[in-house]
Amino acid sequence: MKKVLVYVLNMRGQPLMPCSPRKARVLLKQGKAKVIRRSPFTIQLLIATGENKQPITLGVDPGYSNIGLSAITNKKELFSTEVTLRKNLVKLNSDRRMYRQLKRGRLWYRQCRFLNRVKSKKKGWLAPSVRHRLESHIRIVNFIKSMLPINRIIIEANNFDIQKIKNPDIQGKEYQKGVMKDFYNVREYVLHRDNHQCRSCRKKNTKLEVHHIESRKTGSNRPENLVTLCNICHEKITLGKEIKYLRPKSFKAATFMSIIRWKLVESLKANVTYGYLTKLKRRELNLPKSHTNDAFVIANGISQSRTNPYSVFQNRRNNRCLQKNRKGYKPSIRKQRYNLRPKDLVRFGTRVLKVVSVHSYGKYIRLKSKINKVIDKKILNIELLKYSRGFEYVNER
């Protein structure tokens, strides 16, 4: 049976070795500790005590959508989690750029942005979506370091050869001869690849269009994201009708890992391992493929007793749609900031609920129960338990 642990901080807020739930209950009952975090459950001692610590290794399995982490000692696993990152960041950034550009056009005069790009001013510049994921990796590792006395961090740093993924037999000069060699432009190559016929209805002798399967903002102009369609099928897609065709394989995750792998290692001052070693060790231990198991193997786990993993979900901290246009204009986001915000944890009577939104000028609040039932209550009857700070921890029991 997997054990549940309670994490402990000393009087100065520095991490100690975790204890059992029974010992935590005794300390809380005797007034020797206080609760400072509900999930993962963490207490802080109010008395001086011995600070014996064991060497702890943290294994990190980085990723584009998910992060696996596992902290182990020589005998047992102390913490395990799989973090699910936000997936709508690129779309939200595109929407923000669109609104910013529209705002510039509505003003009487705005100095042009000629030659003042951030990219040319700062070394090590990263795209906002890439920087967000890199900072999310660093943030979750620093959070675990504030909860456990970590001595060593090991990160799996992989380099992906995208051309090798597309064509496993590629070698030598073939790297310099791409699929578009000897073609005038992308459109000419796509039409030739599709044999100058519609990929949907297979018509040839008609007007042909080159269509983006995914938007240019998210899918780019690469040939794999383009498909040949006749004028009729293209109009159907424009009107919102679905047409079946093979969607291209995305290499965003591989590109992302190639960009951030050394930045992540340098930021966390970590040791490095590689994917083929992780795969070999995982097979030797007969463990199923998962992010938490990969992190356990990366941390050099062998026969340590495992703990219940946490599922961590990254949430949006500001929702721009909550601010309504009730006064004839749209004020700045959260200008009238209420004490409670979405995803906060509150107590109503004996029930622990999550905040959905605050309305009626801060007098009422919408709450969501564990069965996703939304209820409406007066805000005066609500007691705050925990602010949502971007990450939501759920213990898998």
Which residue stretches match the model-derived regions?
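Charged, flexible boundary elements
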Residues: 19-51, 179
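Short metal-coordination and nucleic-acid-contact micro-motifs, chiefly zinc-binding Cys/His arrays
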Residues: 6, 190-196, 206, 222-226, ...
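Short beta-strand-centered aromatic/proline hotspots
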Residues: 344, 351-366
